Amino acid sequence: MAHLVWQDDLNTGIQVIDNQHKRIVEMINLLHDAQQGKEHAAIAEVIEELVDYTLSHFAFEETLMEDAGYQFSRAHKKIHELFIRRVSEYRVRFQAGEDVGDELKGLLSRWLFNHIRNDDAGYVDAVRHSMSELVKDKSEGGWLSRSMKRFFG
């Protein structure tokens, strides 16, 4: 498997999410590179970093969806949980000495691109709207500032 290449159709238009997705792609490519060196410790380090980063990305993404009131946030979170379970199984197999690198890279790349194009695309409008409301709210002085003006002139 060659290095993954970011494609424009993967952009959600939410810069912070796109940057996180790109970082995950970079990490999958690092896994590929570590595998070429055949150093177990280097591969283990990349797998751990990739899993940790993905978990934090999921938590961030889920918070954005919940804050935006996205109606399918619970279902989306379930998808994340199932994926985490699958990747955790690969981690255990790797720690037991099994060579799961190619299999794991294939799963990660297929799942990530499919997930971004299909599942993540569903929340984009709600999150973008929520984020624009936050920016608007901040530019208008925020909730407290508006309330103070309304009550005290």
From Swiss-Prot:
Key words of the record: Iron, Metal-binding, Oxygen transport, Transport
Source superkingdom: Bacteria
Disulfide bonds: none
GO MF, any single term: oxygen carrier activity
Pfam families found in the cross-reference section: Hemerythrin
TM ranges: none
SUPFAM superfamilies on file: Hemerythrin-like
Positions contributing to Fe cation 2 binding: E61, H76, H80, H115, D120
Binding site for Fe cation 1: H21, H57, E61, D120
Subunit structure, as described in the record: Monomer.
Sequence similarity: Belongs to the hemerythrin family.
Biological function: Oxygen-binding protein. May be involved in a storage mechanism or for delivery to oxygen-requiring enzymes. The oxygen-binding site contains two iron atoms.
Protein name as it appears in the record: Bacteriohemerythrin
Organism (species): Pseudomonas paraeruginosa (strain DSM 24068 / PA7)
